[in-house]
Amino acid sequence: MILRKRAEEILSLVQRTEKEISSSDEVIMGDVYIGAGETDTIRFIARAAKKIQNRHPDIHYHVSSGNSEYVLESLDRGLIDFGLLFSSIDTQKYDFISLPVKDIWGVLMRRDSPLAQKETVSPEDLWDKPLIISHQRNSSQYLADWFKKDMASLHVVATYNLVFNASLLVDEGLGYALSFDKLINTRESGLCFRPLSPKLEASAYIVWKKYQIFSKAAGAFLECLREEAGYAVQEEKA
C-alpha cells in the first residue's frame, strides 16, 4: 500500500509538470493545488480565485481538506502549492502570508442544552461536560491554555477530524463539540453555537515551501492573494 501511494504521488507530480511545461508563455493556464482545514476563511481564497478567474479563466483549483499535519505533509511532498493553516509556522521551512481574518472558537451544542441559555461559554462551564474536540495536537494545546487545565483532566468523550461528523455526535447527545464558528449551519436545526469567553481566536496563514518554484498559474494566484490580503488590511484600518 505504501509503494502504491508513493507511485500515485509521483504520477501526480509528473502530470502536473507536463501541464506546466505545455502552458503557453502568453496564456496563463493550469492547476493550483490547495490544502486546508475546515474553516470559513476558505472564502478568502474563493474571492481571490474568483477575481483572478476574470483575467485567467483557464486556471483550475483543486482543494483538499485535512488537518495541519496532512497539509504540511502534502506541502513537503510537493502535492499541493499552498496550505491554509492556523498553527504556528516554521519559518525555516515555509514562507507565508498572514491573512486579515480570524476564526472564532466556540461550542456546538443542542438547543435543549442548559448551556444554550448562555450567550457565551466559560472554561468552568465545560470542566465537567462531555467534550468532543479536534484530534489535532496543536488544537489540543491551544484549547488547554484556554481551559487552564491539562486536556487529560477533562472529560473528552470523542475526537473528530471533520466537524460535520462531530455535529452528528452532538445532535445525538454525545457531548459538546469545540470548533470554529460558521462551519455548521445551525439555522432551523436542533443545534446552536456559542462563542467562548474569554474570546479565543485563531489567525489564518497561507503557507508554501521556501524557495518554491511555482507554475505560472500558482504564481499568478499567489500574486492575487497578496493583493487581496493587502486590500483587506487597508479596509480594516480605514
Question: Where does each model-flagged region fall?
Answer:
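Flexible hinge/capping segments at coil-to-helix
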Residues: 25, 94-105, 109-131
